[in-house]
């Protein structure tokens, strides 16, 4: 009997089972213990393979692929700390709903807790963060193949959103020629190998029912808050709110077109807050709200009813309003709850939104970080997509820009970390094959610098704008101690990114004005390659401009 041959047959059943649940992308890191899984994936023609030497980046690459494809993505890593490096992406997926299937190779049980090399306690190591966990036994012909495939099917059927961790122990030897070992065991699955359906099909219904009193609430004064959603959903939500005559407060990730732009500015005006107090119902579609003023208003508003609609399970209202938590796809929910044509009830808010926009436009000529955020819609590639980093840049775009309705926007706004942003953006581009504009800060770029290796081969133009304000300037917006701010919060690195781009053979520009930036972008969009554009800006100008605009708009 060949242990290595049966390991591969066992792994082949696992990987084939994944294809029946829509898995097409498989992300693979190098490793020896994962050989059975890697070879099974490599030999399965249903998969598109992605490789990366850094497991943390690999997990985020899978996250980006899942964001766009809306299908589960598999990740294969070897044993030991390689598994631990998947933790950040796993956490993010749990908060934003992307389906990741983490196939982690492991030592067999007799090598755990006895000093064996590269052997750690992997089973259950992610605690409560995976949506589902599955610890498989060591491959053995004593367990029928139908148990293995039905167990995988059951776990995937239960996976509504987030990550599934499948821990896969394999004994040595891991290498060797294939022979007939386990062939009969494998063939007992019969014509399943030629079929395209799961062995075990389970129906699971999570969608909320139609709210029978909607006809009553849609006649009231309402407010629509739009969080993270798809481009198509964003357009539908904007039309729905317009028909109802309800003000729409759109997040940067809502893709609604933000018909009342600069919400995070005008929500700091007492007149706007007073008018919003008249709302009898607030309907929040989507989660992961960005704006500080929006979150402050959301925490203090007291409508008669506060509804939260999202396809993700769990509580999504940190203010704990009285109301309803409805689990449904946003597009489906809108169809079940049609709008009734009514006149807008807000007067002050549209006026304030227009005045706030004019204040932002008045400052657009200065070459700086805040102005880039305002101008970003002018630089979006046609028929393309935008990936927005975290920290200061996403807040500036949320507060100062107005992105087109239905234009795809992606970000990691679940745990809102700055780790893995370049890797996630790479996954977003690979899954869509669209021209992509990504914008991150300098510390975010440094954090995931080796992900530039993933950007060496792209299928469409990819532009990475690194806003270099020399440190974590988000802390300039917070009451951090002035004497400790630079060393312990901002942590300026005094670096530029030309050498990093050169190391990975990427095109590079460092424009010093808007004309040079526009020229660099024009060239970049003509070539299916990655271009790094570094904008070196005054360190505190972005935060100061935002604070100045907040003060101005609050007194309108």
Curated annotation (Swiss-Prot):
The keyword Transferase is assigned to this record: yes
NCBIfam families named in the record: menD
Subunit organization: Homodimer.
E.C. no: 2.2.1.9
Pathway noted in the entry: Quinol/quinone metabolism; 1,4-dihydroxy-2-naphthoate biosynthesis; 1,4-dihydroxy-2-naphthoate from chorismate: step 2/7; Quinol/quinone metabolism; menaquinone biosynthesis
Catalytic activity as recorded in UniProt: isochorismate + 2-oxoglutarate + H(+) = 5-enolpyruvoyl-6-hydroxy-2-succinyl-cyclohex-3-ene-1-carboxylate + CO2
Natural source organism: Salmonella schwarzengrund (strain CVM19633)
GO BP, one annotated term: menaquinone biosynthetic process
Function, in words: Catalyzes the thiamine diphosphate-dependent decarboxylation of 2-oxoglutarate and the subsequent addition of the resulting succinic semialdehyde-thiamine pyrophosphate anion to isochorismate to yield 2-succinyl-5-enolpyruvyl-6-hydroxy-3-cyclohexene-1-carboxylate (SEPHCHC).
InterPro entries reported for this sequence: MenaQ_synth_MenD, MenD_middle, THDP-binding, Thiamin_PyroP_enz_TPP-bd_dom, TPP_enzyme_TPP-bd
Record-given protein name: 2-succinyl-5-enolpyruvyl-6-hydroxy-3-cyclohexene-1-carboxylate synthase
């Amino acid at each position: 009997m060949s242990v290595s041959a049966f390991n591969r047959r066992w792994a082949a059943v696992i990987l084939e089972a994944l294809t029946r649940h829509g898995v097409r992308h498989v992300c693979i890191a190098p490793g020896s213990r994962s050989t059975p899984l890697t070879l099974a994936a490599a030999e399965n023609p249903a998969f598109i393979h992605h490789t990366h030497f850094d497991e943390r980046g690999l997990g985020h690459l899978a996250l980006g692929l899942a964001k766009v494809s809306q299908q589960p993505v598999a990740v294969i890593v070897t044993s030991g700390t390689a598994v631990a490096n998947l933790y950040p992406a796993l956490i993010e997926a749990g908060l934003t709903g992307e389906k990741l299937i983490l196939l982690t190779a492991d030592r067999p049980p007799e090598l755990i807790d006895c000093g064996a090399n590269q052997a750690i306690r992997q089973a259950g190591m992610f605690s409560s963060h995976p949506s589902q966990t599955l610890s498989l036994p060591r491959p053995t012909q004593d367990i029928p193949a139908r148990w293995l495939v039905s167990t995988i099917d059951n776990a995937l059927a239960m996976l509504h959103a987030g990550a599934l961790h499948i821990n896969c122990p394999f004994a040595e030897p891991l290498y060797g020629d294939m022979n007939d070992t386990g062939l009969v065991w494998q063939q007992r699955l019969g014509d399943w190998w030629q079929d395209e359906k799961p062995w075990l099909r389970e129906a699971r219904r999570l969608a909320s029912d139609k709210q029978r009193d909607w006809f009553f609430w849609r006649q009231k004064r309402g407010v629509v808050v739009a969080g993270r959603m798809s481009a198509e959903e964003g357009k539908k939500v904007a039309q729905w709110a317009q028909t109802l005559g309800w003000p729409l407060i759109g997040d940067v990730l809502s893709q609604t077109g933000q018909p009342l732009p600069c919400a995070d500015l005008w929500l700091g005006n007492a007149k706007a807050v007073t008018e919003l107090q008249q709302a009898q119902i607030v309907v929040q579609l989507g989660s992961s709200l960005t704006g500080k003023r929006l979150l402050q208003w959301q925490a203090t508003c007291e409508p008669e009813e506060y509804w939260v609609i999202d396809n993700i399970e769990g509580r999504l209202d940190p203010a704990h309003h009285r109301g309803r938590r409805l689990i449904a796809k946003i597009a489906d929910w809108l169809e079940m709850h049609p709008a009734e044509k009514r006149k807008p009830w807000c007067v002050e808010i549209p006026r304030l939104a227009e005045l706030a926009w004019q204040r932002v436009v008045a400052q657009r000529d200065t070459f700086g970080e805040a102005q880039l955020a305002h101008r970003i819609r002018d630089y979006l590639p046609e028929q393309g997509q935008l990936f927005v980093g975290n920290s200061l840049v996403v807040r500036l775009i949320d507060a100062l820009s107005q992105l087109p309705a239905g234009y795809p926007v992606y970000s990691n706004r679940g745990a809102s970390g700055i780790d893995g942003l370049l890797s996630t953006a790479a996954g977003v581009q690979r899954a869509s094959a669209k021209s992509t504009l990504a914008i991150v800060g300098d510390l975010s770029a440094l954090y995931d610098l080796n992900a530039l290796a993933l950007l060496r081969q792209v299928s469409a133009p990819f532009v990475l704008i690194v806003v270099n304000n020399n440190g974590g300037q988000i802390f300039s917006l917070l009451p951090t101690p002035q004497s400790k701010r630079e060393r312990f919060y901002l942590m300026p690195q005094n670096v530029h990114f030309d050498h990093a781009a050169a190391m990975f053979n990427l095109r590079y520009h460092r424009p010093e004005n808007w004309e040079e930036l526009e020229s660099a972008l024009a060239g970049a969009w003509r070539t299916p390659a990655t271009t790094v554009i570094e904008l070196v800006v005054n360190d505190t100008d972005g935060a100061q401009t935002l604070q100045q605009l907040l003060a101005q708009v609050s007194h309108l």
